[in-house]
Structures are given as C-alpha cells and as structure tokens.
Amino acid sequence: MFDGQNRTHPARGLRAPSLRGCAASCVASAVAVALAACSALGTPRETPSPLPRAGAPAPGLAAPPREKRGATLSRALRPVLPRGDTRLAVAVLDLDSADQEIASYGTGTTFETASIIKVGILAALLLQAQDEGRELTVDEREYAEAMIRTSDNYAADVLWHAIGEAEGLGAANERLGLYSTRGGPGIGWGLTRTTATDQVRLLRAVFARGPRASVRPPEGLDQASRAYIGHLMGSITDEQDWGVSAAGSRGSRWALKNGWLQRSTTGLWIINSVGQVTVHGHRYLVSVLSGGNRSMEAGIALVERAARAAVGAASAHVRPWPQ
C-alpha cells in the first residue's frame, strides 16, 4: 500500500475528474495501491553524453576534461558507496558550464522510479497540451499541483490515464531524449524503470534556458511548460525537504521531486531524489537513485550523502571571483 508519508487526502479539494479516461481512474487507483508505495518530500532546494551550451558560464576555472568527469564522480562517491545488496546510481550536470557533460556513476543500471515519475507524467501532459494548442484545464492544473507539490497518488493515477499511460510516457520520453526509461505496467506508474542519466536529461528539458532545453527543440517543452514544472518542483511542501536539496548552498533556491517505495517481496526500500540546486552561482541538475535500502531513513541518508558528493565533484572547478 502507499506509504504513510503522503498526508494529503487523495480527493480533498479536487473536483471530480473530468479528464479523458477518468472513468477508469477510480478503479485504477485502488489497484495502484497494491502496486506502488510512492511519495515525495521538497521546496524552494552511459557514458557521459555531450550536451549543447545552455548559456554563458559563471566565472570560474576551466572545467575538467570530459573524459575525466566520470572518474572524478566515482572517486568522490567512493566514501559513501553502500555495502551489501544496496544499489546506487548518480548523475550530475553543471547547467552553467561552458562545456556541458553529464557525469554519471552506475551508468545503465535501471531502478524503479516510485514518485519521481510524476515529473515525467506532467511533462507528457504538457507536451500533449502543446500539440493540441491549448493550456491545461482547471482540473488538470489542480491534479498537477497535487501530484508534484504534495505527491498525491490519486492525482497521479488520473493524469497517468490522461496521458495514455506507458505509451503516452514513451512518446514524451522520445521527444525529450530519454532513451532508457520504460513506463510501468498498466496503472503501475511507480514501477516505471529509469536510469540516473535519463533523469538528468529530463531535468535538463525542464531547467535549461532557451530553445536548447530539448534534444529536439521544436518538439520539446516550451518556455511556459518548463516554467510551470519548475515552479511546482520549487514549491513542494516544507515537510518534504530532503534528498538532493541537501547539496545546495545554504539559503539558495532549489527544486526537486523525491520518491520512495517499499517492496513487499523483500521489505527493502527504493529511495530516489531528482532536482536542481545552486552552488557558487552555478545550477546543478542531480539525480540519485537507490534500491535495497534497509529502511527509508537509511535510504534518505545515502541519497543525501551521494548528492553532496556529486555536486562537490562537479563544482570543484568553480571558484567565486575575489571581492
């Protein structure tokens, strides 16, 4: 069943579903309870793939050669790597670097998303609305806000059906350059499988500035859609402040989405966190995925240590100008 951290009542304050496929969502919601135990916590906190420059770099020293970035990240993560059956994958990107590269650890390893997939669901919904030349309806916006800000699972059920479930998600992923993400079976959106690198690609599609935010710009999220997702990720409820936000500079704004799921077969936890943080004036996109954690608390501690190490490695070349 869903974890107890999702304190918002599924339907409280929301209108009755008026979206395509909502007739099935009530039945689907009950089935989804047996498949995923997902939630999120937050507020305003491969081989590396070459990415186009998103804007002028902030003052700093030259970035390390791209072939060394993965090795630098692996070295930084060494002290925090889990033991036993716990698995970890991390990816990080300096959005304001002149020579952008995704540095990754655990390349190609897939994890179940839990509630971080809610960002992908919203991205797919917005792409479909763009294609239809319309804005989101009042109901869609209410569901989107509940799904991202409070990680409401019923809202995710409704919007998962609205986008066409795994097929609709897959179409959006292709447009946004996510190559290793596969939608969960049936109504099991929380069982979608993804990689840390793909999640940074999705974050780049949201947070990069200008038309280069998408691998295929004419077909990606437009400026209004990116701003909307970023706003919701930056206004997650205060009680949900954990995960990659721990890696940001004190007092800086951040945006994130977390997810967790306890597997009924093993009792072990999947703990994931994705988002944007700012350090030394640079914006970093961070994705930390983990599985096989003995408890939710242990998983959160691991994710936060990994996020700090990843941003530390990525920001080692950045130094503020002397005053």
Q: Where is each model-derived feature located?
A:
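Penicillin-recognizing serine hydrolase domain
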Residues: 2, 39-88, 93-97, 161-323
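N-terminal export and membrane-targeting signals
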Residues: 2-29
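C-terminal motif of bacterial Sec signal peptides marking the signal peptidase cleavage site
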Residues: 34-37
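Short, glycine-anchored, charge-dense loop/turn motifs used at functional sites
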Residues: 94-102, 121
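Amphipathic coiled-coil signal-relay and dimerization helices
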Residues: 99-107, 254
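A short glycine/serine-rich beta->alpha loop
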Residues: 105-111, 185-188
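Active-site SXXK
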Residues: 110-134, 147, 286
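Conserved catalytic neighborhood of penicillin-recognizing serine enzymes
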Residues: 129-179, 195
